[in-house]
């Protein structure tokens, strides 16, 4: 298991315990990647998972740059191209893990950002 998979597993456990349902893991396209695509009620949630051992440079959440946000939005647009039926509402969340790898703390930032260009 890679480090990224390990942190995604932590995030997935946290989100499913909160009632979200996994739709897809690691949606990749040439435009970007979404770590976890989850569903919360009628809302589709694109989740970016980040881990940082310490808080230097702003910590895990701060590492989701504007460029990364744009790539996530493009990857979600690609994901929705295959959607059947009315398009769902979409939200972009970040799960930031930090601290010791054995027991990282989890910070879930709901609606961490809007899709660039959406207002």
Language-model features: locations:
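Domain-level recognition of nuclease-like catalytic cores that cleave nucleotide substrates
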Residues: 82-119
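Hydrophobic residues on conserved beta-strands that form the core of alpha/beta folds
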Residues: 22-24, 46, 92
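Solvent-exposed beta-strand sheet faces enriched in polar/charged residues
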Residues: 26, 50, 93-95
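Mg2+/Mn2+-dependent nuclease catalytic core
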Residues: 53-76, 82
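Short acidic/glycine-enriched loop/turn segments that link adjacent beta-strands
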Residues: 30-32, 102
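Residue-level signal for inorganic ion chemistry
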Residues: 15, 72, 92
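Acidic-basic catalytic patches of nuclease active cores, encompassing PD-(D/E)XK
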Residues: 1-25
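Conserved catalytic cores of phosphodiester-cleaving nucleases, focusing on short active-site segments
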Residues: 34-56, 72
């Amino acid at each position: 298991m890679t480090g990224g998979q390990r942190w995604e597993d932590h995030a997935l456990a946290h989100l499913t315990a909160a009632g979200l349902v996994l739709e897809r893991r690691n949606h990749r396209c040439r435009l970007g990647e979404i770590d976890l695509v989850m569903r919360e009620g009628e809302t589709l949630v694109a989740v970016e998972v980040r881990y940082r051992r310490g808080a230097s440079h702003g910590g895990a959440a701060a590492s989701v740059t504007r460029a990364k946000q744009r790539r996530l939005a493009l990857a979600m647009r690609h994901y929705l191209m295959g959607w059947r039926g009315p398009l769902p509402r979409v939200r972009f969340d970040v799960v930031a893990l930090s601290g010791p790898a054995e027991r990282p703390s989890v910070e879930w930032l709901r609606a961490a950002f809007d899709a660039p260009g959406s207002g």
